[in-house]
Amino acid sequence: MQITEIYRSLQGESSYTGIPCIFVRLTACNLRCAWCDSEYTFKGGRKMSEDEIFAEVQKLAPGGLVEITGGEPLLQERELVPFMERLVASGYKVLIETSGERPLANVPQDVVKIVDVKCPASGEGGSFRIENLDALTPHDEIKFVISDRADYEFAREFTRQHGLENKVSSVIFSPAFRKDARGTRDASHCLVDPQDLANWVLEDQLDVRLGLQTHKFIWTPETKGV
């Protein structure tokens, strides 16, 4: 597989926020989101065998949480699926973060899918494969990264229309960060004020989780390897 980086940090998103986690970040993405914070994954990386990747993961921690991310990791599905199965068989709790643009049917059942449905302001709205809803299980999660009120309304209606609260364990509404965010560790970098987003969720009585990218408040937004 083509790998951009492997490192250990704290999980900064999803319902697993705050838990120590090994991140295996795969190279390449077929989307170009307006607010993308990982453009460095689009090209480059290094070719690694399954054994080499597994050895690096074990060196960082013999067990615990592993997230497969990117880029879009399912672009390398053929090699990735057996690797995820190996991690699960070795006792790791495995998450995969994906846009849902690629089919999800072959992701192992024990792997938690964290699906980032793209909102209109991302420039990739409509990229989600609606048939992937049938591949979701009760332990999976869906995330919407929200840049403005229109994005919020899209996420709200998508959630209601498809009954997501009853389909997955968590539906997460997260404010997008500015692409040029640098230096300070505060909410001023968010494209939509987290307080506004919280108020909208409360006003509409949505059964969703407000998610902040915690790592961008612990470290600076541009810091890599965290």
From Swiss-Prot:
GO terms for molecular function: 4 iron, 4 sulfur cluster binding; carbon-nitrogen lyase activity; magnesium ion binding; S-adenosyl-L-methionine binding. It catalyses: 6-carboxy-5,6,7,8-tetrahydropterin + H(+) = 7-carboxy-7-deazaguanine + NH4(+). Gene3D superfamilies: Aldolase class I. This is 7-carboxy-7-deazaguanine synthase. It comes from the Bacteria. Binds 1 [4Fe-4S] cluster. The cluster is coordinated with 3 cysteines and an exchangeable S-adenosyl-L-methionine. Binds 1 S-adenosyl-L-methionine per subunit. Residues 16-221 form the Radical SAM core domain. Substrate binds at L10, Q11, G12, R25, T69. Pfam families: Fer4_12 (PF13353), Radical_SAM (PF04055). Belongs to the radical SAM superfamily. 7-carboxy-7-deazaguanine synthase family. Keywords: 4Fe-4S, Iron, Iron-sulfur, Lyase, Magnesium, Metal-binding, Queuosine biosynthesis, S-adenosyl-L-methionine. Catalyzes the complex heterocyclic radical-mediated conversion of 6-carboxy-5,6,7,8-tetrahydropterin (CPH4) to 7-carboxy-7-deazaguanine (CDG), a step common to the biosynthetic pathways of all 7-deazapurine-containing compounds.
